[in-house]
């Protein structure tokens, strides 16, 4: 397996798809990277030469990926929580942050249902 940005990318897939295994690189970014490196998108990773892999690695270094990106995202969330913004409060409470209705659904963010005991009549 070839390593790019500390991640083993699959050898059997096309390069443009394999690059998306790196956190922070989607399909469009992968296409831009390959264009910069001068590598055809349809080439399989196993068919790449060491020189082409080197050019791809250099192009990826220009982007913030993997650990650095994860760290930045977590620091951004911590900052929102510390300043007490609405988004920070939603993060702290584990509720949807982007304005979704949470009266009935939002189970992905809220977790499994917690039943509340009925008071006697």
Curated annotation (Swiss-Prot):
| Source organism of this protein record | Shouchella clausii (strain KSM-K16)
Which biological process, per GO, is one annotated for this protein?
Answer: translation
Q: Which InterPro entries match?
A: Rbsml_uS13_C (IPR027437), Ribosomal_uS13 (IPR001892), Ribosomal_uS13-like_H2TH (IPR010979), Ribosomal_uS13_bac-type (IPR019980), Ribosomal_uS13_CS (IPR018269)
Any one GO molecular-function label of the UniProt entry: tRNA binding
> Does ATP-binding show up as a keyword for this record?
no
Spans of biased composition, class Basic residues? 106-121
Report the protein name in the record: Small ribosomal subunit protein uS13
The protein's role, per its UniProt record: Located at the top of the head of the 30S subunit, it contacts several helices of the 16S rRNA. In the 70S ribosome it contacts the 23S rRNA (bridge B1a) and protein L5 of the 50S subunit (bridge B1b), connecting the 2 subunits; these bridges are implicated in subunit movement. Contacts the tRNAs in the A and P-sites.
PANTHER family in alphabetical order: 30S RIBOSOMAL PROTEIN S13/40S RIBOSOMAL PROTEIN S18, SMALL RIBOSOMAL SUBUNIT PROTEIN US13M
How does this chain assemble? Answer: Part of the 30S ribosomal subunit. Forms a loose heterodimer with protein S19. Forms two bridges to the 50S subunit in the 70S ribosome.
* One cellular component term from this protein's GO annotations in UniProt: cytosol
Q: Which family does it belong to?
A: Belongs to the universal ribosomal protein uS13 family.
Region (Disordered) residue ranges read 92-121
**PROSITE patterns tied to this protein:** RIBOSOMAL_S13_1, RIBOSOMAL_S13_2
Q: Does the keyword rRNA-binding apply?
A: yes
* Phylogenetic lineage: Bacteria, Bacillati, Bacillota, Bacilli, Bacillales
| Record SUPFAM superfamilies | S13-like H2TH domain
UniProt keywords (A-Z) are:
Ribonucleoprotein, Ribosomal protein, RNA-binding, rRNA-binding, tRNA-binding
């Amino acid at each position: 397996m070839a390593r790019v940005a500390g991640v083993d990318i699959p050898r059997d897939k096309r390069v443009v798809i394999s690059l998306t295994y790196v956190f922070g690189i989607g399909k469009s970014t992968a296409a831009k990277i390959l264009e910069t490196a001068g590598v055809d998108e349809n080439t399989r990773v196993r068919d790449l030469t060491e020189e082409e892999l080197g050019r791809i690695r250099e192009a990826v270094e220009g982007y913030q990926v993997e650990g650095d990106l994860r760290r930045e995202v977590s620091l951004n969330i911590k900052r929102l929580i510390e300043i007490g913004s609405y988004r920070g409060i939603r993060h702290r409470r584990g509720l949807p942050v982007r304005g979704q209705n949470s009266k009935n659904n939002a189970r992905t963010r809220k977790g499994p249902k917690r039943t509340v005991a009925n008071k006697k009549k």
